[in-house]
Amino acid sequence: MATQQQQQQQQQQQQQIKARKDIQIQQAQSASDILGPPEISETEITTESILGDGSFGTVYKGRCRLKDVAVKVMLKQVDQKTLTDFRKEVAIMSKIFHPNIVLFLGACTSTPGKLMICTELMKGNLESLLLDPMVKLPLITRMRMAKDAALGVLWLHSSNPVFIHRDLKTSNLLVDANLTVKVCDFGLSQIKQRGENLKDGQDGAKGTPLWMAPEVLQGRLFNEKADVYSFGLVLWQIFTRQELFPEFDNFFKFVAAICEKQLRPSIPDDCPKSLKELIQKCWDPNPEVRPSFEGIVSELEEIIIDCCIPDEYGAILWKNHFKHENEANWKDFINVFSNFVGLTNANTPSMSDLLQFSPNLNGSTIELNFKCLKSIIVSSPKGPHEEEVVLMEQFGKVLAWFGNLKEDGSQILDKIRQLMECAWFHGDISTSESENRLRQKPEGTFLVRFSTSEYGAYTISKVSKNGGISHQRIHRPQGKFQVNNSKYLSVKELITGEAQALGINTPCLGSRFLSLIYKAQLSGYIN
């Protein structure tokens, strides 16, 4: 009987807790409805220089509450529909929070003729960067920018109800000081229930025609796959850095070309195959064939890996174990790497455990090999409590410098150690640092370092006859090292074979690797 009473008391307590939670949720929702978007008085906002034009007005750099902001100011003369759309944009932005969506700070919605939206201030838009030939943007950087944009739109499409952007283009993708891309300008966005299709009214299609999907241009039913079509064009411009459809100046001819002839921009021959296929899927005439943004993000992650790690098997390693990451913990990396090249397997302890606990490896060549690998592949922790990590790009560089993972396997570790045993090898130092080390040294003094301008290559820096310092590239075509039309299997063999012809005879001391090599007998566990 006592047990039944206890059960009844527990049930009553649970019901009371649930009732209190329901009341709290209702109160929170009610408060949200009452407060609405953060309202900012027009007197708190000052505008400065013009940044550009948005859907409904001009965007300025400004100040609000002692903070630099971007201020979108509505056109002074607006009709009721435009005003409604403006308030809809404010409502949408006030409910969306994501690292790849421009942060909404507040709005002035109550003063006629003074309607403004305040957002975080960005450095510029992606279109301006892409079309500026003076701005250096490596393909890896551009693909990461594409992924940022895709993550932002994925967040919109994953919401319930679904948000369709409807004006997705590179000028509506803003870039901050760290080159992080964020989606902006929700003036034309539409909300729909999942699975629902929409259709434009008598006013015609909304958005920018050059970036519109065929179904939107033709006034047919559409859904979020219209954004996917636009993103295919975004990807094309991110890769080519060219203007979109410069040959068209007639709207009706453009619509006929896109919708009837299924014309699309030409994809250059040097476009990576996986990226080309993704672009083509995105702008397919059939919306059902186009991928979701979840699929787009997944494919972009693989494309980024391929860009960072050109070595086929190195890319496979990263995709299988660290696909969603730009970096890997050092211990996790050596465990995966060791298993991948056959140094360990499912029946042996992990390499990190072997290096830490196996007395047989203390002072061994294997331990020294991993110390040498660590010295060129690990990024130093930024803080006292942060872990040592391997960056994806650095793994790609190491493979480009030292070998092919499929053919060389664990022998890559031996190649790294053998090069570090050479007193003249200084690794990843800059041109200016190499000149500092060689300054006032005798003629013929030299060092070898990684090239700072050619992927996978090396550079010989030496003191010439007149005391000047010169630099000569060691290329690596088809896996062999070449200088003066002579090819060798290793950098060490090249230096020995070409020393007289190159006028080099005395290694420049000061390599950071020498202490690592000659203190090997004192080595213990890799920290």
From Swiss-Prot:
Residues 45-304 form the Protein kinase domain. Residues 424-513 form the SH2 domain. It is found in: Membrane. It holds the Pfam family PK_Tyr_Ser-Thr. Its EC number is 2.7.11.1. One of its GO terms (cellular component) is cell cortex. Keywords: ATP-binding, Kinase, Membrane, Nucleotide-binding, Serine/threonine-protein kinase, Transferase, Tyrosine-protein kinase. The active site is at 167 (proton acceptor). SUPFAM superfamilies: Protein kinase-like (PK-like), SH2 domain. InterPro entries: Kinase-like_dom_sf, Prot_kinase_dom, Protein_kinase_ATP_BS, Ser-Thr/Tyr_kinase_cat_dom, Ser/Thr_kinase_AS, Ser/Thr_Kinases-Pseudokinases, SH2, SH2_dom_sf. One of its GO terms (molecular function) is protein serine/threonine kinase activity. One of its GO terms (biological process) is phagocytosis. ATP binds at residues 51-59, 72. It catalyses: L-seryl-[protein] + ATP = O-phospho-L-seryl-[protein] + ADP + H(+); L-threonyl-[protein] + ATP = O-phospho-L-threonyl-[protein] + ADP + H(+). Disruption phenotype: Cells lack polarity, move very slowly, and exhibit an elevated and temporally extended chemoattractant-mediated activation of the kinase Akt/PKB. Belongs to the protein kinase superfamily. TKL Ser/Thr protein kinase family. SH2 domain-containing protein kinase subfamily. PANTHER family: DUAL SPECIFICITY PROTEIN KINASE SHKA, SERINE/THREONINE-PROTEIN KINASE TNNI3K-RELATED. Required for proper chemotaxis and phagocytosis; proper spatiotemporal control of F-actin levels in chemotaxing cells. Negative regulator of the PI3K (phosphatidylinositol 3 kinase) pathway. Predominantly phosphorylates serines and threonines and tyrosines at a lower level. This is Dual specificity protein kinase shkA. It comes from Dictyostelium discoideum (Social amoeba).
